[in-house]
Amino acid sequence: MAVPKKKTSKSRKNMRRAHDFLTAPSLSVCPQCKSPKMPHRACPSCGTYKGKEVAGAAKQA
């Protein structure tokens, strides 16, 4: 089984982990109801996508 020859320093460990962070999701505004929604997805509040009513959208009453 392979074993590390040298101890990995804190600096090298942290440099390796520099790209492991999470990015916040980008949000766009729904043109119908002006609520925030994720791009390229149907609006969760009004159920429209590209100006059309999406079948099977859960309406909040």
Curated annotation (Swiss-Prot):
Residues 1-20 are annotated as: Disordered. Pfam families: Ribosomal_L32p (PF01783). GO terms for molecular function: structural constituent of ribosome. GO terms for biological process: translation. The keyword Ribosomal protein applies. GO terms for cellular component: large ribosomal subunit. It comes from the Bacteria. Residues 1-16 have a biased composition (Basic residues). InterPro entries: Ribosomal_bL32, Ribosomal_bL32_bact, Ribosomal_zn-bd. Keywords: Ribonucleoprotein, Ribosomal protein. The keyword Lipoprotein does not apply. Belongs to the bacterial ribosomal protein bL32 family. This is Large ribosomal subunit protein bL32. The lineage of its organism: Bacteria, Pseudomonadati, Thermodesulfobacteriota, Desulfuromonadia, Geobacterales.
